[in-house]
Amino acid sequence: MRRLVAIGLLLICCATLHAQQVTQHSFTVKGDSLTITYGLDRQADICVRVAIDGGHFTPPLKGLEGAVGKGVKPGDSLTITAFRLPEIQGIDSASLSFLVEIDDGALLLYVDNLPFRMMPVEGGSFTMGCTRPRGEKNTYSDEIPTHKVTLNSYYIGQYEVTQALWTAVMGENPSKWIGNDSLPVEQVSWNDVQIFIARLSQITGYRFRLPTEAEWEFAARGGNRSRGMTYPGVNSQVWETCWYVLNSGGRSHPVGRLKPNELGLYDMGGNLLEWCSDWMESYSANAQTSPQGPRTGENRILRGGCFNSPSWGCSVFERSWYLPDYGYSFFGFRLAMDSAERDEE
């Protein structure tokens, strides 16, 4: 085995950008073992990934011991030990980087060296539509009647698609609000998004799509972890999770700067309206399983409110719709897919 020239240690928390949960301390190498020491400010599931020579980070490593895995309790000097370094493929490389992060079950994917994250949403049933008392202010007829919806498991983007990811796939940036690659892409129509999704699927081998309206609302509500909030993750403190008319300054903001909802999803309310796959139609009181919306229509659904929306426009049940060939500076989207299996054809 060639002598290790450098081992880089990267300790971050990818489960939340608004508050660090993992803090860096130190690492030591002795023989064939590596020991990482880190701090954790709250109980969490922890995993470790490795990147070889500046490449992509691997799926979580197995065979580790110490403060790793499920339900790690907080502490200032927690340790993780890898006893069999030579068994890591590529360990004889000149440079290794280790990533210690909150294990939120995310699928970490790349276009070139640009990472993006797809979050698992466990299937389940929920009540779709406006759950405010009937007749309450800012309740609209298109949000009722409420109805039971049952969904299979799926994945959804942790963030709105960024300008960096769009540019990596499409080679250009159509957005009005620029200056930071982490800004969500906007000024994209529903039809534009279909072209992007087809190209991204071809590049990565994964079958991406837009979420259905029901999938979007279930995820915004927090899925099976929902606490029954009116807005993503909150009941009244809209500013904690949503960029809207009173805190946005009249423009979009980089993704992931506010708090996430119960599923670890960011900006499900506010920032940009998000395209869904469905044509617009009125609700029915009938229970549905994996609804796809009507086969034809005039307008496509948008969800979540935007930076110019009032607070009630960012609720988990607020609906919007528009012609599929229009893209404005407050229209964006996030990705969805059925499974983590790649298309090998």
Regions found by a protein language model. Give the residues of each.
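Extended beta-strand/loop cores of jelly-roll/beta-sandwich
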Residues: D103-A214, N299, S320-E345
